[in-house]
Amino acid sequence: MSNIAEVSRGGGHYGVDPWRQHIIKNRINADWWIRLDHWETLLADLRGVSFEVNSSRSQVADFINRVPKDLPAGVSVRFPGPRGNLGSTNYTEVYFVRIKSELKQKLLSLIAAADQGKNRDVEIGRPNAPVVSTGAGGNQAIVAQRGVNTVRDQQPLRDGSLHYRYLVQDIELAGAEQFDRALFEETFSLNWTVVAPPAGGGGGGAP
């Protein structure tokens, strides 16, 4: 589901020239726009990832990719406004978080960090490093020695986990801009022109 699919169309429009000048030319529509409640859920999901477990780590891309990110507005689609009646229990303000290129890159870096190689000893059961052991009577046997491969493989995983946590922290502290309808239209110098429906609702000719 896209953001714009949830927005009602018609009833008016923004000016075509201001839209081109302030939105298209400045690539505002190329930024990610995530509804505030979806953004808060995404951050909670990313914080909850157990990086050391591959099945949990592999969810990072899904968490990020499934969130609608398109600009919830168009020339003839007005940015979402509040829902319900002001002062009543059904009133809800609608905010979107704008994810610019720098913050977008950090989110994409989370996917890359989570895609690092598996801990091969723990997750695909690679045998332990064999060593030759000399027993009583001089008999020699090849036995597995725990720890050699484990240390080698788990250290990058620990480093990756630390890097992932720092990235999540940076994303949370970045303070992404929030927009409601009024802020969006004020910031990008857009005016919504109301267009009245055709007389009779456009349902045919005169009687």
Curated annotation (Swiss-Prot):
Recorded superkingdom:
Viruses
The protein's matches in SUPFAM superfamilies, at most eight in alphabetical order, are given as: TMV-like viral coat proteins (SSF47195)
Q: What is its main location?
A: virion
Q: Which residues lie in coiled coils?
A: none
Q: Which GO terms describe its cellular component?
A: helical viral capsid
Name any one GO molecular function.
Answer: structural molecule activity
Keywords from UniProt, A to Z, are: Capsid protein, Helical capsid protein, Virion
Q: Which positions form S-S bridges?
A: none
Q: What does this protein do?
A: Capsid protein self-assembles to form rod-shaped virions about 25 nm in diameter with a central canal enclosing the viral genomic RNA.
Q: Which organism is it from?
A: Peanut clump virus (isolate 87/TGTA2) (PCV)
Return the protein name: Capsid protein
* Pfam families membership: TMV_coat (PF00721)
